């Protein structure tokens, strides 16, 4: 018989623990899932990354960004290289990931101290819907434990924004960040300032657009887009403001190449519109159309890391 506990019940049983966030972001077109875990300290994040990398299973890639763990995971089930931590074995891992309607089920294994992580720390996180424990569950000491953690199915939505300001007023980066932090739908994930071609004759001053990403439930996507549109419209000083929308974990190569080359090439609006149509980017005129190139390029640069903020010469 399986025991099912909600996060509040886990906390009542084991006490408060340390996981501050656990998000499962799904891209069903590509069969990819990204799991993002927010830890309270570097120590557990670093140990978990190293051990999950050894363990393998359905984890294809795992890295840490400060105290945040980011994992790219395949759907399905795979055998683990699991056991007491060694050069060949990892002490914690995920052997299965499945989509069940609007939920994601992941099966976690942990041994000794790592069993506390999968048995109490992760299940007690507020973002978890429920955790299923087997009858013989024991954690800590030298015990091996496994649980199924069920979380909401989330989708990554990237909003590109450009031309909300004028030479007299406003800043697109500030407007977009305020929008993201105030948005009641989804989870605000990232804010990126995108440096565009500084030689553009239509630039305000620095020639930057912005990309903001959210992890959001499917049923809230339209509400998120509507909120962002209304916010930009209310807070734009320009008659050229444009927003773009992209859903998914993988930026198409054509779109990424356009974003990068927009830092040095003078594109026409028609070029941006073609790339957007080819790559599934929705272009929305908020107060005008002048920001189309920058807003499309913002999506293309959203996953470029530090390169998003610079021009090609910065990285030669």
Where are these regions (language model features)?
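Conserved mixed alpha/beta catalytic, RNA-binding, or beta-rich assembly cores of soluble enzyme
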Residues: 1-316
């Amino acid at each position: 018989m399986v025991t099912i506990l909600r996060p509040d019940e886990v906390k009542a049983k084991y006490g408060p623990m340390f996981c501050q966030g656990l998000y499962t972001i799904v891209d069903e077109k590509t069969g990819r899932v990204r799991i993002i875990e927010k830890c309270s300290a570097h120590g557990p994040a670093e140990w978990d990354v190293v051990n999950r990398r050894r363990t393998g299973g359905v984890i294809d890639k795992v890295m840490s960004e400060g105290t945040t763990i980011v994992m790219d995971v395949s759907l399905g089930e795979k055998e683990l290289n699991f056991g007491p931590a060694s050069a060949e074995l990892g002490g914690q891992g995920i052997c299965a990931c499945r989509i069940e309607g609007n939920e994601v089920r992941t099966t976690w294994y942990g041994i000794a101290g790592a069993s506390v992580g999968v048995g109490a720390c992760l299940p007690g996180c507020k973002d978890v819907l429920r955790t299923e424990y087997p009858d013989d569950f024991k954690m800590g000491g030298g015990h091996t434990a496994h649980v199924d953690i069920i979380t909401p199915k989330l989708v990554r939505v990237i909003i590109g924004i450009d031309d909300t300001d004028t030479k007299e007023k406003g800043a697109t980066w500030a407007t977009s960040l305020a929008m993201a932090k105030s948005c009641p739908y989804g989870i605000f994930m990232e804010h990126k300032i995108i440096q565009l071609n500084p030689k553009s004759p239509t630039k305000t001053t620095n020639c930057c657009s912005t990309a903001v990403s959210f992890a959001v439930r499917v049923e809230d996507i339209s509400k998120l887009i509507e909120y962002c549109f209304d916010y930009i419209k209310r807070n734009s000083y320009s008659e050229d403001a444009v927003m773009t929308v992209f859903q998914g974990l993988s930026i198409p190569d054509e779109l990424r190449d356009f974003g990068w080359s927009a830092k040095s090439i003078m594109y026409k609006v028609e070029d941006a519109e073609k790339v957007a149509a080819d790559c599934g980017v929705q272009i929305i005129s908020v107060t005008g159309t002048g920001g189309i190139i920058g807003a499309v390029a913002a999506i293309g640069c959203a996953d470029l890391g530090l390169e998003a903020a610079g021009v090609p010469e910065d990285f030669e």
